[in-house]
């Protein structure tokens, strides 16, 4: 009898939590979106595309994930900023997102070649996670050419060694 009561209470609490999440307008994450969330974490996407992520040891509210950063990355290529991927995904279809992952050669320090070499299913899963997360934040600052001085803060990369 006690076991039945404990199970019934657990189910009631779980059902209440699910109902409250539904009332708040939170939608259930699909298996593909969950996989995309996992890939985002293990591939290090948050390291640059989520402000404060590395500094906090990854303790940034998920509502802020992948909203870009105002920290610039300055080197011989100019100054680049990590894009707000949640806004980028809102502007693209899934097919366009995959095509961009395959064809874009982005400026450093973005490891575009890692994204290019991901399996289509992984890129699609990331897209589905971004769509699930929805739009948030502001667009990243615009690229600054090498001959222009960027506004701080930025990380200064040294020039490559001369050959």
What is the predicted role of each segment?
Residues 1-4:
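Positively charged n-region of N-terminal signal peptides that target proteins for export
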Residues 8-15:
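Bacterial N-terminal signal peptides
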Residues 16-21:
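Sec/Tat signal peptide C-region and signal peptidase I cleavage site
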Residues 24-31, 42, 50-80, 95, ...:
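Flexible coil segments in periplasmic/lumen-exposed cytochrome c-class electron-transfer proteins
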Residues 37-43:
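Local sequence-structure signature of Cys/Sec-based thiol-disulfide redox active-site neighborhoods
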Residues 47:
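Short, cysteine/histidine-rich loop/knuckle motifs that typically chelate Zn2+
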Residues 86-88, 99-101, 112-113:
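A structural feature that tracks compact, well-ordered secondary-structure segments
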